[in-house]
Amino acid sequence: MSIRAIIVDTAGTTTDLNFIQDVLFPYSRKAMAEFLEQNQHNVVVDYCISDVKDIALEPDATLERVTEILQQWIDEDRKLTPLKTLQGLIWKQGYNRVEFTGHIYPDFIDSIERIKEKGIRIYSFSSGSVEAQKLLFSHTEAGDLTGSFNGHFDTRTGNKLDKQAYCNICNTISLKPKQILFVSDVAEELKAAEAAGMTTCQMIRFADQRQAKCKKISSFSELVFD
C-alpha cells in the first residue's frame, strides 16, 4: 500500500533539539511571569491558569505560584496542554519581535517539494501546541513553510507515547494506518505509532540516540516513495 501522508515529529526530527532546549524553553521560562501578569484577563490565558491550578491540585494558587509551577514544568519538560499553549503564545511574542527564527533542518526543507510532487500530504505532530508549530514553520530562514503542510497535531490529539493518539490522527485525516508514514527520532513514539498500524521511520540525527526497531534514516533526502 503506497504512502499517502507523512507525519513528522518536530524536535530532533525537523528541528534541532538544541534550538528547543537552549532558545525556546529558556525564553518562555524567563518571560512567563511578565506575560501572565500582563495577559491574565485574556480568555485563553485565564483558561490555562485555571487548568494549571486543577492539574497541580492547588485551586487557590496565586498568580506568582502559578508562574512557579509553570517554570517547574518547563524545567521538567512536562508535556501538559496549558503549559504548551502558554509557551506558544510567549514564543509568538518572541518571533514577532524577531528575537529568534525557527530552526528547520535544510534536508527537510529541500525534501518538501519532492514529497508534495508525489501527491503526499504533510502533517506535523508535536508536544508543542499547534500554534507553536505554525510559528516554528512560518519563521524560518527559508521563509514561511506553513503552506506546505496539510495540518498540525498536538497534545489535544493525545500523548505521543500513546497508541490512541495515532489512531485519532488516522481518523482525522481519513486514511488507513499503513498509508501514513510517521517519522520521529524517539523510539517510544515510533513504537506507539506502529502499534496503531502506521508505517514508521526513525530519524537519526545523533549517534547516541536510542534505536527503534524500524527503518532508519539520517536525512529526509533518504526517504523513497513509490
From Swiss-Prot:
Coiled-coil intervals, chain numbering: none
SUPFAM superfamilies linked: HAD-like
Cofactor note: Binds 1 Mg(2+) ion per subunit.
Gene Ontology biological process terms in this record: L-methionine salvage from methylthioadenosine
Pfam families on file: Hydrolase
GO molecular function: 2,3-diketo-5-methylthiopentyl-1-phosphate enolase activity; 2-hydroxy-3-keto-5-methylthiopentenyl-1-phosphate phosphatase activity; acireductone synthase activity; magnesium ion binding
Catalytic activity: 5-methylsulfanyl-2,3-dioxopentyl phosphate + H2O = 1,2-dihydroxy-5-(methylsulfanyl)pent-1-en-3-one + phosphate
InterPro entries to which the protein is assigned, alphabetical: Enolase-ppase_E1 (IPR023943), HAD-like_sf (IPR036412), HAD-SF_hydro_IA (IPR006439), HAD_sf (IPR023214)
Enzymatic class: hydrolase
CDD domains in the cross-refs: HAD_EP (cd01629)
Named cofactor requirement(s): Mg(2+)
EC code(s) of this entry: 3.1.3.77
Superkingdom of the source species: Bacteria
Pathway(s) where this gene product acts: Amino-acid biosynthesis; L-methionine biosynthesis via salvage pathway; L-methionine from S-methyl-5-thio-alpha-D-ribose 1-phosphate: step 3/6; Amino-acid biosynthesis; L-methionine biosynthesis via salvage pathway; L-methionine from S-methyl-5-thio-alpha-D-ribose 1-phosphate: step 4/6
Keywords carried by this UniProt record: Amino-acid biosynthesis, Hydrolase, Magnesium, Metal-binding, Methionine biosynthesis
Quaternary organization: Monomer.
Family according to the record: Belongs to the HAD-like hydrolase superfamily. MasA/MtnC family.
Task performed by this protein: Bifunctional enzyme that catalyzes the enolization of 2,3-diketo-5-methylthiopentyl-1-phosphate (DK-MTP-1-P) into the intermediate 2-hydroxy-3-keto-5-methylthiopentenyl-1-phosphate (HK-MTPenyl-1-P), which is then dephosphorylated to form the acireductone 1,2-dihydroxy-3-keto-5-methylthiopentene (DHK-MTPene).
Stated name of the protein: Enolase-phosphatase E1
Organism expressing this protein natively: Shewanella frigidimarina (strain NCIMB 400)
Gene: mtnC
